[in-house]
A protein has these predicted regions:
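N-terminal intrinsically disordered, cationic/polar leader segments
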Residues: 1-90, 95-152, 182, 186
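N-terminal processing/targeting junctions
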Residues: 113, 157, 169, 191-195
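Intrinsically disordered, low-complexity sequence elements enriched in Ser/Thr/Gly/Pro
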Residues: 128, 161, 167, 185, ...
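Intrinsically disordered, low-complexity terminal tails and inter-domain linkers enriched
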Residues: 150-179
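Long, low-complexity, intrinsically disordered segments
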Residues: 174-195
Length: 195
């Protein structure tokens, strides 16, 4: 595992309207605002789109299994924004659903908005990361330490004493690698009686 540490930059809230290609609109916005690294969260509805729902077979490099959907599907998802050879690359994963059917995967090439898609883009600053094609896996991977910094290696894998040092807390009730706040919320939700 590698990781990079940075800071939060600007925050944008977007509305993508009926008939607009959500993927193209967001890519254009990211370029226009010169967002090099960040994350996007979105929800709304899509009239049609194309999605990779996994590989045809679990081999490396993978052969993508494409699914085309149309007819007005609810959507929510997220994506990462990292610099690539031709500028910022946005990598989206989403779930879409309609009338008891659902798909989850990587949105690709086209996603036409039905009514609207709302998106929140959060810019990151100070990250040493970029997306590069990996010959072995056949996909574009985030590579740490390529923007002037050095990648960090994860410390304390499974060692309780080092976990306390690196996170400033001890694990409680087997919450593993969850952050303290998220772990507390999950514990609270799982202890509540059903309403």
């Amino acid at each position: 595992m590698q990781y990079s540490e940075g800071q939060l930059g600007r925050v944008f809230v977007l509305r993508i309207d009926e008939g607009e290609d959500f993927l193209a609109a967001l890519q254009e916005f990211v370029r226009k605002k010169e967002i090099r690294t960040g994350s996007v969260f979105f929800l709304g509805a899509l009239r049609e789109g194309r999605m990779v729902t996994g590989p045809e077979k679990p081999i490396i490099p993978p052969e993508p299994h494409f699914v085309f959907f149309e007819g007005g599907w609810e959507v929510f998802g997220m994506g990462t924004i990292f610099p690539g050879d031709e500028g910022p690359m946005v990598h989206y994963h989403a779930s879409v659903g309609r009338a008891g059917h659902a798909l989850t995967g990587c949105l690709r090439e086209r996603a036409v908005t039905y009514l609207l898609v709302e998106a929140v883009v959060i810019e990151f600053t100070g990250l040493a990361i970029r997306r590069e094609f990996d010959e072995k896996t056949g996909v574009h991977l985030p590579v740490h330490g390529t923007e002037g910094g050095t990648p960090e290696k994860a410390k304390g894998t499974g060692d309780e004493s080092s976990r306390k040092e690196t996170t400033g807390r001890e694990d409680k009730e087997g919450d593993g690698d969850l952050s303290g706040g998220l772990a507390a919320i999950i514990r609270d939700l799982t202890r509540r009686p059903a309403s």
